[in-house]
């Protein structure tokens, strides 16, 4: 199964490295749109001002999976559309994620197994929130219910 991960990011250096590390082994392709939406442009921003671009430029990509589109966007949906023309023709699924999402390998593997067994057109995943690091869980969906499909 070939999965493209699509990400939008602007000033997202907090867990961007961990996000990329968590999905890279499972990706056929990673498509990233980096840049501000209109609100941030109106505040004078033209690109990320934290370490986002440094992380993107230096992330190890030995398999040439990553495509980065830099730009300024009207809204987030336009930012997503900016990377779509770069998606390979042989991709089975696109997994949209935010730059602050980190996945455990067992969760990605479980979802891939489900997708291989059934041909779903849309799948949602549960989330949980952390504060100050991955040790401090502050909320999210009930983790005991291990149900990825909606």
What is each model feature region?
Residues 2-4:
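Cell-envelope/extracellular polymer assembly enzymes that use nucleotide-activated donors
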Residues 6-7, 31:
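Short hydrophobic beta-strand elements that form part
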Residues 10, 37-38, 73-75, 100-102, ...:
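Short, solvent-exposed loop/turn segments at secondary-structure junctions
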Residues 12-40:
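Short, well-formed alpha-helical segments that are part of the catalytic scaffolds
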Residues 33-92:
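Active-site-proximal specificity loops/subdomain of glycosyltransferases
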Residues 84, 104-150:
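Conserved catalytic core of nucleotide-sugar-dependent glycosyltransferases
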Residues 90-104:
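Short beta-strand-to-loop acidic/aromatic patch adjacent to the donor-nucleotide binding site
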């Amino acid at each position: 199964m070939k999965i493209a991960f699509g990400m939008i990011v602007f000033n997202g250096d907090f867990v961007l490295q961990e996000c990329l590390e968590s999905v890279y082994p499972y990706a056929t392709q990673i498509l990233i749109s980096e840049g501000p939406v209109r609100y941030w442009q109106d505040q004078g921003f033209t690109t990320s001002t934290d370490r986002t671009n440094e992380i993107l430029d230096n992330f190890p990509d030995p398999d040439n999976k990553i495509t980065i589109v830099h730009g300024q966007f009207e809204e987030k949906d336009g930012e997503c559309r900016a990377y779509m023309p770069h998606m390979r023709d042989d991709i089975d699924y696109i997994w949209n994620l935010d730059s602050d999402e980190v996945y455990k390998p067992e969760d990605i593997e479980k979802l891939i197994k489900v997708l291989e067994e059934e041909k779903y057109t849309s799948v949602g995943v549960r989330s949980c929130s952390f504060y100050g690091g991955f040790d401090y869980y502050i909320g999210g969906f009930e983790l005991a219910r291990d149900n990825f499909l909606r």
